[in-house]
Structure formats: structure tokens, C-alpha cells
Curated annotation (Swiss-Prot):
Cofactor binding remark: Binds 1 Fe(2+) or Fe(3+) and 1 Zn(2+) ion per subunit, catalysis is optimal with 1 Fe and 1 Zn. Electron spin resonance indicates the presence of a mixture of protein molecules that contain either Fe(2+) or Fe(3+) and Zn(2+). Mn(2+) is not a cofactor.
Protein name: Hydroxyacylglutathione hydrolase cytoplasmic
Assembly with partners or alone: Homodimer.
Record Pfam families: HAGH_C, Lactamase_B
Gene Ontology BP terms: methylglyoxal catabolic process to D-lactate via S-lactoyl-glutathione
Tissue: Mainly expressed in flowers and flower buds. Also detected in roots and leaves.
Gene3D superfamilies the UniProt entry points to: Ribonuclease Z/Hydroxyacylglutathione hydrolase-like
Signal peptide (from-to): none
Amino acids binding Fe cation: 58-59, 135, 174
Length: 258
């Protein structure tokens, strides 16, 4: 399995997932279809289907166009989201196969949108796990609670995604990492892992390189939204429960002007 970034718009990422045995490919959130198709051609891959994380235009806005450009392509999207151009709806636990060797598991991760899907991808033997989290989980952050609650985001981040293997690579929908880590330091100023990752992320961006992927293990160490069960964070924010802490961290992030 190979995964390639396709930078789009101002700070979006689409992704190309290639099964090396067959050259078959899936694309995640191809908002700029021409760019994604060019990447597939460069890597001599054949696009078979689209994995849409959620209905927002900067993720699903290229679906109709890619259907025109790639005959017989399938477009997957969450059954509870009104995904533009969707041909096949998926629900939590649905399984797909790409080529000969890649398994894909749909995970319902609502809150940013009510039907948001994250896609957990690995090889036939479970090797090289990766998860495409759209705007639910960012590196050191999470999406705004546009269509859901703190309870839902807690379930999505701290139960559903946190249960994946720790080496799982995290591929999210936007390059927000530096700002997210700067905010994370306001929550945990003495967290050395956050300090180290922020220094690295700044270097990456100065070199015009992506900060993605992260890993689930790194997120559990540095992402304040995945650390809301930590007593020291709850105490600092004056909260009594992980869900209250999730709500408070989101409120602080929404008001933060770093």
C-alpha cells in the first residue's frame, strides 16, 4: 500500500491510496479532481472509487466532476450526510476492498457533521494501518462542532479512534498543525512532546513540507482533545468530567486568537 498527499485549495489535503499488487487506487476527498487524476497518472494507478469523509464543499465538492472524468467510478459517503455525488452510502462497520491487498473499514465519527465517516485502511494481514479522519481529528486538534455535541466528539475521538492500534498513521483533511500545537501549549504549557512536535512542525512548514501523517500514539500524547480524560487538564480547566473538558477545550479553541 502506498499513500500520496495531493494538496488542494488553500490548506486541504486529498489523498491517493494505491494497492501495489494491482495498481488500483482510491482517492479521499478529491475536491480538485484534475490534480488527483494527475497524481494517479504519475504513479501509474487506476482510480476505482472515492472515499468522502463528509459533505462540506471543500471535501465533497469535486465528486460530480470526478464522476464525469473517470467512467464507472464509485463515490462512497456517510449515509447520514448529504454527500454530493454519492453513489454508495456507507455506515459504521461497513467494509470495502481496494485491489487485492487493502481492507477499508468505515467508522462513523460524528460531530463536525452528523454523518462524518473516517476510513481505517490496512493490508490483508493488518499491516501499515492508516486512518483518514477528514475534519473530525486533525493533528493536535479536531473539527468544529457544527452538527454535533461534545458527547459525540468525545465518542468519536476518545472511544472510536482511540481504540485503533497506536502505530496507525493519521491523515487528516487540513494543514492546521502549527496553529493547533500552539493552542495545545496553552492547555499544557509543560508538555515536552507538544513543544518538540511544534518545533518540528514549524520546520516542516518553512520547508513547504506536510506535517501529516501523525500517528495515533502521537495524538494521544499531544492532542488536547484526545487528552480530556487527564485529571491535570480537567483540574486546570475547572471541569469535572471528560465531556465537560471536551466542551471547554473546544470553547477555548474557538475563542483563541493565537
Amino acid at each position: 500500500m502506498k499513500i500520496f498527499h495531493v494538496p488542494c485549495l488553500q490548506d486541504n489535503y486529498s489523498y491517493l491510496i494505491i494497492d501495489e499488487s494491482t495498481g488500483d487506487a482510491a482517492v479521499v476527498d478529491p475536491v480538485d479532481p484534475e490534480k488527483v487524476i494527475a497524481s494517479a497518472e504519475k504513479h501509474q494507478a487506476k482510480i476505482k472509487f472515492v472515499l468522502t469523509t463528509h459533505h462540506h464543499w471543500d471535501h465533497a465538492g469535486g465528486n460530480e466532476k470526478i464522476k464525469q472524468l473517470v467512467p464507472d467510478i464509485k463515490v462512497y459517503g456517510g449515509s447520514l450526510d448529504k454527500v454530493k455525488g454519492c453513489t454508495d452510502a456507507v455506515d459504521n462497520g461497513d467494509k470495502l476492498t481496494l485491489g487485492q491487498d487493502i481492507n477499508i473499514l468505515a467508522l462513523h465519527t460524528p460531530c463536525h457533521t452528523k454523518g462524518h465517516i473516517s476510513y481505517y485502511v490496512n493490508g490483508k494481514e493488518g499491516e501499515n494501518p492508516a486512518v483518514f479522519t477528514g475534519d473530525t481529528l486533525f493533528v493536535a486538534g479536531c473539527g468544529k462542532f457544527f452538527e454535533g455535541t461534545a458527547e459525540q466528539m468525545y465518542q468519536s475521538l476518545c472511544v472510536t479512534l482511540a481504540a485503533l492500534p497506536k502505530p496507525t498513521q493519521v491523515y487528516c483533511g487540513h494543514e492546521y498543525t502549527v496553529k493547533n500545537l500552539e493552542f495545545a501549549l496553552t492547555v499544557e504549557p509543560n508538555n515536552g512532546k507538544i513543544q518538540q512536535k511544534l518545533a518540528w512542525a514549524r520546520q516542516q512548514r518553512q520547508a513547504d513540507l506536510p506535517t501529516i501523517p501523525s500517528t495515533l500514539e502521537e495524538e494521544l500524547e499531544t492532542n488536547p482533545f484526545m487528552r480530556v480524560d487527564k485529571p491535570e487538564i480537567q483540574e486546570k480547566l475547572g471541569c469535572k468530567s471528560p465531556i465537560d473538558t471536551m466542551r471547554e477545550v473546544r470553547n477555548k479553541k474557538d475563542q483563541w486568537r493565537g
